[in-house]
Amino acid sequence: MSWQTYVDDHLMCDIEGHEGHRLTLAAIVGHDGSVWAQSATSPQFKPEEMNGIMTDFNEPGHLAPTGLHLGGTKYMVIQGEAGAVIRGKKGSGGITIKKTGQALVCGIYEEPVTPGQCNMVVERLGDYLLEQGL
């Protein structure tokens, strides 16, 4: 299965039980910041943004004072899972990033999608990739 198929079929899909509700943007990115696959409307990811995210996975709390920046958008960092998941909030939307052995699975949402729904979609794929050794 191609990385693009994971984005299209597992991240940009309808939320379970909520037809028509889906993430706004999604991407799978290598730990080095290289984009493996992304939704059609994903922004350009800057190297300094990816460096900050990877630093936060290695040093939880690193992004809390400055916020999480991705694609030029700033998110307030909210409780995640140290070393495994970073979550952010901006207005009525937000972001979830799940770290796997080789990649970062990113999902961005806006209402009516809820933070919990975004977490479920992103973390489910991330957990699957971890189980596959990826």
Swiss-Prot record:
Keywords: Actin-binding, Allergen, Cytoplasm, Cytoskeleton, Disulfide bond, Phosphoprotein
Keyword Disulfide bond annotated: yes
UniProt key word Cytoplasm: yes
A Gene Ontology molecular function term of the record: actin monomer binding
Pfam families given in the database record: Profilin
Sequence positions bearing Phosphothreonine: T114
InterPro entries listed in its UniProt record: PFN, PFN_euk, PFN_sf, Profilin_CS
Location of the protein in the cell: Cytoplasm, Cytoskeleton
Motif Involved in PIP2 interaction, chain ranges: 84-100
PTM (free text): Phosphorylated by MAP kinases.
Domain of life of the organism encoding this protein: Eukaryota
Disulfide bonds: C13-C118
Major subcellular location class: cytoplasm
UniProt subunit comment: Occurs in many kinds of cells as a complex with monomeric actin in a 1:1 ratio.
More details: The variability of the residues taking part of IgE-binding epitopes might be responsible of the difference in cross-reactivity among olive pollen cultivars, and between distantly related pollen species, leading to a variable range of allergy reactions among atopic patients.
Stated role: Binds to actin and affects the structure of the cytoskeleton. At high concentrations, profilin prevents the polymerization of actin, whereas it enhances it at low concentrations.
Similarity-based family: Belongs to the profilin family.
Protein name: Profilin-3
